[in-house]
Design a protein with these regions (language model features):
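Non-catalytic cap/lid and distal C-terminal segments of serine-dependent acyl enzymes
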Residues: 1-301
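Single conserved hydrophobic/aromatic residue that forms the stacking wall/gate
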Residues: 299-302, 306-309
Length: 309
């Protein structure tokens, strides 16, 4: 669907490059591994189908961050965090105690910047062969079926969330979707494009070139009865892969859609940077502080709660 092999390989190479996160972007105290009050990462396997091919029953894998003190006696918001075209459920690093996503979450919670919530990193390819290499990239585009029919129901059956039985839309304000590159495309095309009844918070980090154009997203938002609590975007100005597409997908949305208002429930953040984790970790750090704020901190305006915006 519009991918050139050269662009794909370039995106994969940049995704897999080693990154030293700049402490000026994400304060050092949020990057530290906590010796106390630390959450845990669980690895899950859940039943699904090969939605790209013949609908064969398969098993998919994902990683789940549970905040410190997680209890079945409490209810938690859930962020579904998507990877890029060269990654899988492990690309965000949520595989062990050294995960930067985990460290940021642990510290944001410890310093009371956010209320505790769950983070899920699934494999965004909805097909049996969902490996980093050798899989069909078009399987990214049917992930919405797996998300709706398999992953969200599994999470809500096995973890303590705000799920309302028989009515997923009743708890949409307790779910968020975000992702890097191809995962940013999935957030726009699938999260907003197909699943507004399931989510109300969205984050696109360097959204991929096949993301819906702003005009299409604006029409979707105008036609849906659901509102957007927040749509956060970030992209590097030196990103040769995604800057033009990400800007075309989101930058002018408030001018096209009455449901999005700059600094109220929408932000476009661009800064010097390329198509890599310098941008994406900062995107996660910022979005983690924006998501669920109207739920957890109703007395604060969303634009007052972000960092480095």
């Amino acid at each position: 669907m519009g991918h050139s092999e050269e662009m794909i390989q370039k995106a994969i190479a940049q995704e897999n490059g080693k990154v030293h996160v700049n402490a000026q972007s994400i304060p050092e105290k949020y990057q530290q591994k906590r010796a106390d009050e630390a959450g845990v990462i669980e690895h899950i396997r859940y039943p699904s189908k090969d939605y790209f091919l013949a609908g064969k029953e398969i098993t998919k894998e994902a990683n789940v961050y549970l905040p410190y003190g997680y209890s079945r006696d409490k209810k938690y918001n859930v962020l579904y965090l998507m990877h890029g075209i060269g990654g899988d459920e492990a690309e965000w690093g949520m595989v062990d105690e050294d995960s930067l996503v985990k460290r940021m979450m642990d510290n944001l919670i410890y310093y009371k910047e956010i209320e505790p919530f769950i983070v899920v990193t699934p494999n965004g390819r909805s097909t049996e062969n969902c490996a980093r290499e050798g899989s069909d990239y078009n399987s990214f585009y049917v992930f919405g079926k797996e998300l709706r029919s398999d992953l969200i129901p599994y999470m809500e059956a096995h973890y303590s969330t705000y799920a309302v039985e028989g009515d997923p839309s009743a708890s949409r304000m307790h779910r968020a979707m975000a992702g890097l590159s191809m995962g940013g495309m999935q957030t726009i095309n699938i999260g907003i494009g197909e699943c507004m009844d399931l989510f109300s918070y969205f984050g696109a980090f360097s959204a991929a070139p096949t993301s819906n154009l702003a005009e299409k997203t604006a029409k979707i938002l105008e036609d849906t009865p659901y509102t957007v609590d927040y749509f956060y975007n970030i992209c590097g100005t030196e990103d040769e892969i995604a800057y033009d597409s990400a800007a075309a997908a989101a930058k002018n949305l408030p001018a096209l859609c009455d449901k999005l208002k700059e600094s109220d429930n929408f932000i476009w953040q661009e800064l010097k940077g390329m198509h890599d984790f310098h941008i994406w970790y900062l995107g996660f750090f910022n979005f983690a502080q924006i998501a669920f704020k109207s739920v957890s901190y109703t007395h604060l305006r969303a634009h007052e709660t972000g960092r480095n915006l």
